[in-house]
Amino acid sequence: MELLSTIRIFSSPNMKDLLIQLSQGKVIIYPTESVFGLGCDPDNKNAISTLLKIKNRSWKKGLILVAANYTQLLKYIDDSCLNETQRSRVFSTWPGPMTWVFPAQANRSYWLTGQFSSVAVRVSHFEPIQRLCLAFGKPLVSTSANLSGQLPARTIEEVHDQLGYKIPIMHEDILGRPNPSKIRDVMTGKLIRE
């Protein structure tokens, strides 16, 4: 019942259906700041496995989590080793299109971190992502909606061309940023992806 009252607050043409799909361990497609994203429940190993198969992506690469707020990420990251300068650097870019690679919690799931002991996370300012993560109550796995090695999809037509018609899509437009989020290491500030 609580889920249904939450859905009414966050209006989107098919929000209720998307939340049901996520809670059942399914993969969805949703708009991000620059491209369409494939997403699923970060706590559901089968959902992540399905996402990796759809994308034809190796589990070793790890995945990004996108959240509505910092609190949603605390289950997945270990921020205890950050000093004030590092914290300030992160919070000066969030919410926004900056992904930070944090040390992962000790009980991390290898299907999120891949071969690494870290996890990439982002707090988005983009309203559709905010609504989706708040309504779902946790972050989403976030990777571009395309086959590995192909260009990321910027339109629903491009999504259908690469991934077909079986995955439910959040019917809203991308924000239109020209590039995916930058990725930086939280400990060093080093740029990993421009």
Swiss-Prot record:
Its main location: cytoplasm. It catalyses: L-threonine + hydrogencarbonate + ATP = L-threonylcarbamoyladenylate + diphosphate + H2O. Residues 12-194 form the YrdC-like domain. One of its GO terms (cellular component) is cytoplasm. It is an enzyme of class 2 (transferase). InterPro entries: DHBP_synth_RibB-like_a/b_dom, Sua5-like_dom, TC-AMP_synthase, TC-AMP_synthase_SUA5. It holds the Pfam family Sua5_yciO_yrdC. Keywords: ATP-binding, Cytoplasm, Nucleotide-binding, Nucleotidyltransferase, Transferase, tRNA processing. It is found in: Cytoplasm. It comes from the Bacteria. GO terms for biological process: regulation of translational fidelity; tRNA threonylcarbamoyladenosine modification. The keyword tRNA processing applies. Its EC number is 2.7.7.87. Belongs to the SUA5 family. TsaC subfamily. HAMAP family: TsaC (MF_01852). This is Threonylcarbamoyl-AMP synthase.
